[in-house]
Amino acid sequence: ICNLLINSKFLPQLHIVLLDGIGFGGFNVVDLPKLAETLQLPCIAVMRRQPNLEAVVDAMSRLPNLEKRKELLQRAGTIYEYPPFVFQVCGEDPEIIAKVLEKLTDCGKVPEALRLAHLITAAVMKGESGMTSV
């Protein structure tokens, strides 16, 4: 993520970094504090619901580097719940982030930018954006 943004023309335009959860492609866990520090921006991992951490660790135990993955999960910090939002944040006060998420969310629990990114990715990968696409 850092490599994509550091030398891009877009970095100066960013105010926050929104992530759809703390992991990519399964259990490739993001180092949220390092990301926030490197980019000098608040970084937020938004979740649709409170995760079952015991089940997450159990699933990760089947993969290599369990201890490193657990460390990254812990480094990401507290999981905050400001209904309807569940998130982890580094680089800003959680109360401020809850207000920011409200402004970025049209309806539901997911900020529009993440919802749109998901739709675009699904369309590119599957040729459609959902089960109802024709």
Where are each of the predicted segments found?
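Generic secondary-structure signature for well-ordered alpha-helical cores
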Residues: 6, 65-68, 78, 102, ...
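Long, charge-dense
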Residues: 32-88
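Domain-level cores of phosphate- or acyl-group-handling catalytic modules
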Residues: 8-12, 30, 37
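A glycine-rich, hydrophobic loop/mini-helix early in the fold
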Residues: 1-24
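Residues that form generic nucleotide/phosphate-binding pockets
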Residues: 4, 59, 72-76, 100-104, ...
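Gly/Ser/Thr-rich loops at beta-strand to alpha-helix junctions
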Residues: 21-30, 49-52, 92-95
